């Protein structure tokens, strides 16, 4: 039962950090490459 409580308290925290990082990354990409339909990295 302790493992379930640990999972329920950890997964939302990790998801929040991951989605926050992903949102920040997308915002920065759109800042340097505005209105890009295809990322011009290659």
From Swiss-Prot:
Task: State the annotated membrane topology for this chain.
Answer: Single-pass membrane protein
InterPro entries tied to this protein: PSI_PsaJ, PSI_PsaJ_sf
The main location is plastid
GO CC annotation: chloroplast thylakoid membrane; photosystem I
- Respond yes or no to whether keyword Mitochondrion is given for this record: no
The record lists the membrane-crossing segments as 7-27
Q: Where in the cell is it found?
A: Plastid, Chloroplast thylakoid membrane
In the UniProt record, does the keyword Transmembrane occur? yes
Q: Name one GO biological process term.
A: photosynthesis
Which Pfam families does the protein's record reference?
A: PSI_PsaJ
Which keywords label this protein? Chloroplast, Membrane, Photosynthesis, Photosystem I, Plastid, Thylakoid, Transmembrane, Transmembrane helix
User: HAMAP family annotated for this entry?
Assistant: PSI_PsaJ (MF_00522)
By its UniProt entry, which PANTHER family does this protein fall under?
PHOTOSYSTEM I REACTION CENTER SUBUNIT IX, PTHR36082
Protein role: May help in the organization of the PsaE and PsaF subunits.
Family from the record: Belongs to the PsaJ family.
Q: What is this protein called?
A: Photosystem I reaction center subunit IX
